Design a protein with these regions (language model features):
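Conserved ATP-driven motor cores of ASCE-family P-loop NTPases powering translocation/secretion/packaging/pilus
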Residues: 226-308
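Intrinsically disordered, low-complexity acidic/polar segments
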Residues: 39, 164, 255, 305, ...
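RecA-like P-loop NTPase motor core of helicase/translocase proteins
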Residues: 7-12, 170, 204, 226, ...
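Conserved P-loop NTPase motor module
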Residues: 291-343
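P-loop NTPase motor domains
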Residues: 1-224, 290-300
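Repeat-unit-sized solenoid/scaffold elements
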Residues: 59-73, 96-100, 232-255, 273-280, ...
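Generic, ordered loop/turn and secondary-structure boundary motif
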Residues: 50, 54, 132, 212, ...
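Glycine-rich loops and low-complexity Gly/Arg-rich segments
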Residues: 55-59, 75-78, 178-182, 226-231, ...
Length: 343
């Protein structure tokens, strides 16, 4: 989405399409977890994201329990490490020699087998280059700086594309952004000054059921945001191919839904939760063109309506104001003339 993406052509072959940065220029910033991959692909990133170990909370690890195959007792043991070492808990744990785990567990009053399992599973995090002991610049403060300027941000993962990486980073960054938004919102509500009002923020997540299934929704920051219903000026745009896996309470909070063709009965039922005329809409959903139509319903429209999606091609680029080649040169010349006059 940031710089360039692949897209299937009508013949089934894959071609390249422009990303948001190419179309909207300075209105979009690309933050990357993998600057080397970005450079190899010619991506013009704006910031390389590094996350210090002391920003990883136990809650972030708890949300990864399924991906890490972590037992609940191992997660609970994390709090015993936090009680002794505070924010340095993860760094201290990862630096333990496996031979010393029993002594370490005795020091904090934990079961050796639980600490051993926790240590073994969390060692996987060391393969992520963006996790470091110390960082020069705080990625979340940088994100907030861009947001305050009204600049949209695409977080690019590069070759760090595992679900474990995606869920870890999404949880950490979103949790901290939400914390800052709560502070900004409370300051605005207390003083009532227009200049303190936070910019409305929409956070987009793919594979949303990973964060918002019944178990994860109680543990991740995304469940909190969904239940708050924009209370702190933060909303979620959730994208998923398996809506039936998303917690029912969360689905009931989704105000506007854009739904393409669905064939699974459970997914159809989930999307139509709380919607009037569900039986009629069920037949509409089942008859949509798989690539060109979507059903739009909810707060954004007075009644459900089927829309035809636009092709993402050169015609669309032009409609968005994108120009290149000779036309770009002419536009640049015209802008210079407007600024300095013809010479």
């Amino acid at each position: 989405y940031g710089w360039q993406a692949t897209q299937e052509s009508g013949s089934g072959r894959r071609g390249f399409v422009k990303g948001l940065k190419q179309l909207f220029g300075s209105k979009v910033a690309i933050f990357t977890l993998d600057p080397e991959s970005a450079r190899r692909r010619g991506v013009q990133s704006d910031f390389a994201v590094k996350i210090p170990y002391n920003q990883v909370m136990v809650e972030d690890i708890a949300a990864l329990a399924d991906e890490l195959n972590l037992h609940a007792t191992a997660v609970e043991s994390s709090y015993l490490i936090v009680n002794k070492y505070g924010r340095d808990w993860l760094s201290v744990l990862l630096h333990q020699d496996p031979k010393d785990i029993k002594d370490f567990a005795d020091q904090i009053g934990a079961h050796p087998e639980s600490i051993s399992a926790l240590h073994r599973k969390l060692k996987r995090l060391e393969k992520f280059d963006f996790l470091q002991e110390k960082v020069i610049e705080d990625a979340v403060f940088k994100i907030m700086e861009f947001i305050d300027k009204g600049i949209h941000i695409v977080l690019e993962f590069g070759q760090q594309s595992s679900f474990l990486c995606y869920m870890l980073v999404a949880n950490i960054l979103t949790r901290r952004i939400h914390d800052l938004y709560v502070m900004k919102s409370e300051r605005y509500l207390a003083a009532g000054r227009t200049q303190d009002k936070p910019k409305q923020l929409i956070i987009t997540i793919e594979e949303a059921h990973k964060f918002l299934n019944p178990m994860a929704a109680r543990q991740t920051i995304f469940g909190t945001i969904a239940r708050e219903m924009r209370k702190y000026f933060v909303s979620l745009l959730i994208i998923d191919q398996r809506p039936s896996s998303i917690d029912d309470e969360i689905m009931s909070q989704v105000g506007t839904r854009i739904t393409s063709l669905l064939s699974d009965e459970k997914d159809i039922a989930a999307v139509l939760t709380g919607v009037s005329n569900a039986s009629w809409l069920r037949s509409v959903l089942a008859s949509l063109d798989s690539k060109q139509q979507a059903l739009l319903m909810g707060h954004a429209v007075p009644m459900p309506v089927v829309i035809r999606t636009r092709d993402y091609d050169g015609v669309f680029y032009t409609a968005m104001g994108h120009v290149e080649g000779e036309e770009l040169a002419q536009k640049a010349h015209a802008n210079i003339a407007d600024l300095f006059g013809d010479r």
